[in-house]
Amino acid sequence: MRKLRKILLSTIFALTVSTTFFANTAGTQTVTAASGTAVTFKRKVIAYRTGSVYNFVPMGNAADNRRALSLLMEGNEKKVININNNVHIDTYLRPGNNTTINAGKHTITSDKGVIINDPTAASYTNFKNLTINGGIWKNSSSSGLAGTMMRISYASNISINNTTVYTNYKGHGIELISCSNVVVNNCTLKAQGKCSKTCVEEQLQIDLASPTTAPGLYRLSKKLCNGTPCKNITVKNCTIQGARGICANFAGAGNEAKYRKARNYHSNITIENCNVTGISAEAIALFNTKSATVKNCRITTKTPKSRNSYSVGLAVAYQKGSAPKATTKTKNVISLTNNAVKGGQQGIFVRSNASKKLGTVIVSGNTVSAKKGKKNAIKVLSAKKVKIAKNKTKKW
């Protein structure tokens, strides 16, 4: 009798699952199973849900994997997506607000890039609360994508942790455009393929929104390119290698001169405990950034000194235009401390080419080497207040 009862229950359960899978297959369906709630797409289970947590089940091809993951990630409700297998997708995933992606040590391979959002308004709160934990994110080409792998724009409260991102030297592993309150922690961003001697693309790009710095946004809407900068960006415990390692960008000349005003300057950028290498340009270049902290980092450019300013290890510069008023307040401080820096023309170089000087510049406790000689290891020009102390300088 017990055996017969088990058979009947199994039959009823199988019929329930079958009916749910084949009803209204144009959209995503759910059915309660022993392992939780099965979420289906195209008559196949794509995830098992427990509350707001979804355990993704890979599908048969890259396009369906991307569609299924995008369905799970869309919307504004709080959700956690667990990727528990290696996954191949055909193009970018577009997560919604309040999304956490846990990828562990699994590899997500894309025929294009991997993460993107398309903002609808020029506001830091247009997209918010995205967390990416883990994963090896790469392009299907062995030489990497000559574009952007993760592009996040007009966003706030973004956290990227323990991820590895591979990109071509001509591309960007992570591009932040007009973002606020971002943490990139314990990540590896590494370029692939061959690096030309004149390549200046960075693996971590911190951008303002202008037609030349954010052409993808300009194609979406011209209104998105109003010169909004980034603020409150923290990069810590990361290993980054590219033509350039990290760059806070500035708008071009000519028609873009209107985006070289004080309101377009990045602020409160922190780079801490990182190992950053530039192969054909600066390891770290912070342009039009009025406040920044770089500390406890190993910073090396392998660029020949004949490349002049591109061969600097750590560069901070105001470009031509109308800069912020030079003050000594904390909102206008550049602090470079306890770093090991190797450069060509200079190891550390700080200068204003704009209408105003920088505010306070602190360079202390660093070990700085320059191929051009010990006297060129550290140069700080055009600052209202300068503190240079307890540094060791060398030629290498």
Regions found by a protein language model. Give the residues of each.
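Sec-dependent N-terminal signal peptides of Gram-positive bacterial secreted proteins and lipoproteins
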Residues: 4-24
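Sec-dependent signal peptide cleavage junction
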Residues: 20-36
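Acidic Gly/Asp/Thr-rich repetitive segments characteristic of extracellular carbohydrate-active
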Residues: 40-82, 88
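Extracellular beta-strand/beta-solenoid scaffold signature
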Residues: 65-70, 89-92, 110-123, 141-152, ...
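Parallel beta-helix/beta-solenoid
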Residues: 76, 96-98, 122, 127, ...
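Beta-solenoid repeat scaffold
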Residues: 91-112, 118-135
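Leucine-rich solenoid repeat scaffolds
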Residues: 360-396
